[in-house]
């Protein structure tokens, strides 16, 4: 039996594409196989910590921690990287509630959660596994605006 911390930008009820569905299926199958799984994800976009606080619940045998958007009062507009980094910071803070539960491995699902996954793997001093499910170009049918492309690809 392994203790697995999955970090994902999407997990039900936040499902934008296939990522949330994949992580949900993988998490529930790992629980069915006898593993202890925690998924760290986020609350819906555009919500605030007062109306949508960070939650810590168990669903289908999977402990799901969904971080409140932080800082919710910032209007990031088209600054995708600022939003991703701010949300990553919120996810790290939410993940620190696990100090009584130490994973054997952290599994990052996609580049969007690289920051919180790396930070938590280092905090717990455990290996990090990363699956890059898509690129931004792939998510946008091969077209990414100049600003977003420059932010993501440098």
What is the meaning of each model-derived region?
Residues 1-63:
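N-terminal subdomain of nucleotide-sugar transferases
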Residues 3, 104-105:
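Structural motif
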Residues 9, 132-135:
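Histidine-centered beta-alpha loop that forms part of the nucleotide-sugar donor binding/catalytic region
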Residues 20-21, 80-81, 143-148:
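Short glycine-enriched, charge-decorated loop/helix-capping segments at active-site entrances
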Residues 35-103:
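A conserved catalytic-core segment of Leloir-type glycosyltransferases
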Residues 108-113, 132:
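Short His-centered aromatic/hydrophobic patch
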Residues 126-129, 137-154:
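Nucleotide-sugar donor phosphate/pyrophosphate-binding loop at the beta->alpha transition
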């Amino acid at each position: 039996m392994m203790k697995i911390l999955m970090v994902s930008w999407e997990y039900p009820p936040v499902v934008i594409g296939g990522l949330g569905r994949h992580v949900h299926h993988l998490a529930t199958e790992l629980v069915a196989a006898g593993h202890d799984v925690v998924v760290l994800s986020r609350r819906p976009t555009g919500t605030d910590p007062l109306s949508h606080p960070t939650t810590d619940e168990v669903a289908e045998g999977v402990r799901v921690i969904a971080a409140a958007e932080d800082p919710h009062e910032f209007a990031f507009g088209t600054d995708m990287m600022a939003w991703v980094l701010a949300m990553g910071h919120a996810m790290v803070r939410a993940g620190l509630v696990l100090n009584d539960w130490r994973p054997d491995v952290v599994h990052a699902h996609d580049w969007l959660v690289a920051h919180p996954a790396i930070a938590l793997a280092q905090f717990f001093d455990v290996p990090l596994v990363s699956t890059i499910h898509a690129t931004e170009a792939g998510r946008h049918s091969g077209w990414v605006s100049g600003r977003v492309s420059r932010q993501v690809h440098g």
